[in-house]
Design a protein with these regions (language model features):
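Local beta-strand N-terminus motif with an aromatic residue
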Residues: 64-65
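Class I (Rossmann-like) S-adenosyl-L-methionine-dependent methyltransferase catalytic domain
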Residues: 1-6, 12-53, 80, 88, ...
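A conserved beta-strand element that flanks and buttresses the S-adenosyl-L-methionine
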Residues: 69
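Conserved amphipathic alpha-helix within the SDR
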Residues: 52-60
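Helix-to-beta-strand junctions that scaffold the AdoMet/dcAdoMet cofactor pocket
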Residues: 77-78, 93-94
C-alpha cells in the first residue's frame, strides 16, 4: 500500500461505519502503514441530492477518486436509481481510475432460502442487466462484467479513460 492512501467510506449505517473504521485503524496499527480513513454517513437520497449541487452552485470543488467500489447496495435498488448512482460515481472517478459495482446473480442457490426463510429479498441481475447500468458517459469498451468463483456475485468494472 502506498503511503499517500486516503480511504473514504460511505454508508447509511453509523454502526457499520464505526466497525469498519475501527477494523482499518487496527490494520493500520498492526501494519505500521500510514493512511487516512474518513467515514461519511449518507443515504442514497443524500448522494443523489448532493450530486446536483455543483451543477447549481458551481462553487464546490470536485473530489476525484482513483477507485470507487460499491458493494451490497444495488441488490436493493431499482435500475433507475442504480443508473443515477453509476453516473455520479463515474463523475467522481479520476481519469484512469476504476469504478466497480456488484450485484447478486439470479442463479444464487440460496435465493429461495433467503426469500422464504429469512424474508430477505434482493433485486437480482444478470451480467447483461448489470452491463445496462453503465454510466451514460462511459465508453462501451471501458467496461466488463466478471463473476466470482461461485458465479453468484457479479462485478461491473468500468475503467475511466486516462484522458477523462
Amino acid at each position: 500500500m502506498r503511503e499517500q492512501v486516503e480511504l473514504t467510506l460511505t454508508d447509511f449505517n453509523r454502526e457499520t461505519l464505526e466497525h469498519v473504521r475501527k477494523a482499518l485503524n487496527d490494520i493500520k496499527e498492526r501494519s505500521g502503514r500510514k493512511f487516512t480513513v474518513q467515514v461519511q454517513k449518507k443515504t442514497v437520497h443524500q448522494l443523489i441530492k448532493e450530486s446536483l449541487k455543483p451543477a447549481v452552485s458551481g462553487d464546490r470543488a470536485k473530489r476525484e477518486f482513483d477507485f470507487i467500489y460499491c458493494t451490497g447496495l444495488f441488490d436493493y435498488l431499482s435500475d433507475h436509481t442504480c443508473r443515477q448512482l453509476m453516473d455520479i460515481f463515474y463523475d467522481l472517478v479520476a481519469p484512469g481510475g476504476l469504478l466497480v459495482a456488484t450485484n447478486v446473480e439470479p442463479s444464487n442457490p440460496r435465493r429461495n432460502g433467503m426469500a422464504y426463510l429469512l424474508d430477505w429479498h434482493l433485486i437480482y441481475r444478470t451480467a447483461p442487466d448489470l452491463r445496462a447500468l453503465k454510466p451514460g458517459r462511459a465508453p462501451d469498451d471501458a467496461l466488463c462484467v466478471r463473476s466470482d468463483a461461485t458465479g453468484v456475485n457479479l462485478f461491473l468494472e468500468i475503467r475511466k479513460p486516462a484522458n477523462g
